[in-house]
Structures are given as C-alpha cells and as structure tokens.
C-alpha cells in the first residue's frame, strides 16, 4: 500500500524513495521482524492454550526430544503473518508475481496447518493429513501457479529450463514446464518440511535461501544488471525481493522464539509454506537448478529419507541410523546445537556456491 505514495512524489519529493525496490525490501524486512517480535508472545500463549499438550513427540525418536513435550506448534502462523503484513505494506500491489508467489505460500501454509491440526488433536505425529491427498493438493496449487507464470511471461523463456554456467542455454519444455515447475515447488516445500526437526534448524537456512533469492530476483528483474551478468531478464520479478525481505524479517522474529530451547515449533504450517515460496520464486526468476544448490541442505535431507526408505524396502537394511539425516547425527552422539550450527554453516557455503553461478558464464 505504501507503494502508492509515489503518486504524491510531485508534491512531496521524499516519497520518491518508494520507487526503489531496495528501500521497500528493507522496509518489509523491518516490518516483518517487528510484527513477529511484538505479536509473537500473544500468538504463542494462544497456541499453547488451544493445543494443550502441544506438538506430539515421536516415542521412537531421539530420547532428548522428550524434554520438548508440551511445546506448541503451528509457529508458521507467526512467520506467515509477518510475511503477509510486510508484503502488503511494501510491495507493489499491481505486480502479478507478488500475488502468485503469495498464493502458493498461503496455499501450502493452509495444507500444513490442517496437517498440524490433525496431529495435535489426535496427539500422534503419524496421524496427520494423508500423504497422497496432501501431495495432490500441493501439486494442484503448484501447477496452477506455474501455469499462471507461463501465461504471464508469454514468451519461450517462460516455459524454458535455464541451464546455469552457460550463456543463453535454455531447454524449451513447452507446456511440460507446468509439470516440471510444479515438481520443483512441491519438492521444495516437502524438503524444507523434512528439515524442520530441530530447534532453529530449518528457519535459518530458509532465511539464507530467501536472502539469496531476494538478490537473484532483484538482478533478474533489472535489465541492466541482467545484461551485465548475462542472466535472463524477467521483467517484474524484481518485486519478489520485497517478499524475500519480509520473509527474512519475519524469520528473524521467529528465530527469537525458536532458538533452543524453543518456545514454539514452526510446524508444517510454516515449513511447507516457506519451502513452497522458495520453489515458486525460483521458477518465476528462472533459477530452478540454482535452487538445488542454494537449498542443497534441504535436498540432502530429502534424499536421505528417499535413500533410507528405498534401501529398507529393497534390502531390509537402513543406510542411516535414522532419517532425515539430522536425526542420524543425533543418534551418533552429536548434540543438537552442534548439528544445527554445522548445518547453518553448510547452508551459507551452499548459498555462496549458488550465487557464484550468476557470474560464472
């Protein structure tokens, strides 16, 4: 909404600052953080009151997790609220990319919320939303968003898979891109969901990825920078930096309450939504493959589960002591802070590697 203050810039020159994406990104970040800082305690108290026993803890999981019993979940509501407030206040409301990504984020958030609701009411981590139905709804949301992105672009690039490291190399998938894009979005959502198993483990890598894609969005949406870096220019996607800024701020606010020992868990409400958001931004700015690098930690967590399940079904043996892989290291004797901080370091290194692809052509 503040974007419209530009209309009064001729009378009040100071309002010209609202033309700049960088200024509005910073504003969205501060707004998201302040909202969560101020409203967080109230949200946590209400969730604790309504949930009673809080998030159910797996009896077959690491014994150290039993001390977390009674901690409320659905903390993603805090992040999503800060994200929406920051975005609505600071983003250009006429930019379609903003609303497409926001629709995916909230759609995935609703699916995650329902899953959390079932787990809390049944007090069982195994009795959430049926997997096949959850994936189906996620796929429909993601496919609709990717279809909208292709229609919005109206050029071969919008339905093409761009290959990093090479100049002007893109594979036009036609309408098959809708399915490919949906796979990326759904995969990202569930990969982040699998990562969210320890206090602070998921939110910081999500913020690192959001900061990275905020930069990529800004560069891809700027014709001058895109030409200089020889990346594909996608008009209008620069505005997605504002969403990334809002997520970064809301994430910082959430981390204040999610730091060990956590006062609240993000739950599927947050992890599915934020993963879906990252996936849809990557599709919008044509950096789907780069997402696999920047979000490599999420990929590692997802692959560890796939390998574990496949190995057990085929051979009857497990590759890891427990999956996802962060639980494997818990079983090996690593403390929770060791795992979390080391995974943060990996996330930073992968983000730098992913961003380096912008210049390596």
Swiss-Prot record:
Domain of life from the UniProt record: Bacteria
Pathway: Cell wall biogenesis; peptidoglycan biosynthesis
Keyword Nuclease found: no
Keyword Repeat: no
Topology class, membrane: Multi-pass membrane protein
Catalytic reaction(s) noted: UDP-N-acetyl-alpha-D-muramoyl-L-alanyl-gamma-D-glutamyl-meso-2,6-diaminopimeloyl-D-alanyl-D-alanine + di-trans,octa-cis-undecaprenyl phosphate = di-trans,octa-cis-undecaprenyl diphospho-N-acetyl-alpha-D-muramoyl-L-alanyl-D-glutamyl-meso-2,6-diaminopimeloyl-D-alanyl-D-alanine + UMP
Annotated PANTHER family: PHOSPHO-N-ACETYLMURAMOYL-PENTAPEPTIDE-TRANSFERASE, PHOSPHO-N-ACETYLMURAMOYL-PENTAPEPTIDE-TRANSFERASE HOMOLOG
Record protein name field: Phospho-N-acetylmuramoyl-pentapeptide-transferase
Protein's organism: Rhodopseudomonas palustris (strain BisB18)
């Amino acid at each position: 909404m503040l974007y419209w203050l530009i209309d009064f810039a001729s009378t009040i020159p100071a309002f010209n600052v609202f033309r700049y994406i960088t200024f509005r990104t910073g504003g969205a970040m501060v707004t998201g953080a302040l909202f969560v800082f101020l409203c967080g305690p109230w949200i946590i108290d209400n969730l604790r009151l309504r949930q009673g026993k809080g998030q159910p803890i797996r009896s077959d999981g690491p014994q150290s997790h039993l001390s977390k019993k009674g901690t409320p979940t659905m903390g993603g509501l805090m992040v999503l609220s800060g994200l929406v407030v920051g975005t609505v206040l600071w983003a250009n409301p006429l930019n379609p990319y903003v609303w497409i990504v926001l629709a995916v984020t909230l759609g995935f958030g609703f699916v995650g919320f329902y899953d959390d609701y079932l787990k809390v009411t049944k007090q069982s981590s195994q009795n959430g939303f049926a997997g096949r139905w959850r994936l189906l709804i996620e796929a429909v949301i993601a496919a609709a968003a990717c279809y909208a992105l292709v229609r919005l672009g109206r050029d071969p690039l919008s339905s093409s898979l761009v290959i990093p490291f090479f100049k002007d190399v893109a594979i036009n998938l036609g309408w098959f891109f809708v399915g490919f894009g949906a796979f990326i979005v759904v995969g990202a959502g569930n990969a982040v969901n699998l990562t969210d198993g320890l206090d602070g483990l998921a939110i910081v890598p999500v913020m690192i990825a959001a900061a990275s894609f905020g930069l990529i969005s800004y560069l891809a949406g700027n014709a001058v920078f895109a030409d200089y870096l020889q990346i594909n220019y996608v008009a209008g996607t620069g505005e997605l930096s504002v969403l990334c800024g809002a997520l970064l701020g809301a994430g910082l606010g959430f981390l204040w309450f999610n730091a060990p020992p956590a006062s609240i868990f993000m739950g599927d409400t947050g992890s599915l939504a934020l993963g879906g958001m990252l996936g849809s931004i990557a599709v919008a700015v044509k950096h789907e493959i780069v997402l696999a690098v920047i979000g490599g930690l999420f990929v590692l967590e997802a692959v560890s589960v796939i390998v574990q399940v496949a190995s057990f079904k085929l051979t009857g043996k497990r590759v890891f002591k427990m999956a996802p892989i962060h639980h494997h290291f818990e079983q090996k004797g690593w403390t929770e802070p060791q795992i979390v901080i080391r995974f943060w370091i990996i996330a930073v290194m992968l983000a730098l590697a992913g961003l380096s692809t912008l210049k390596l052509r």
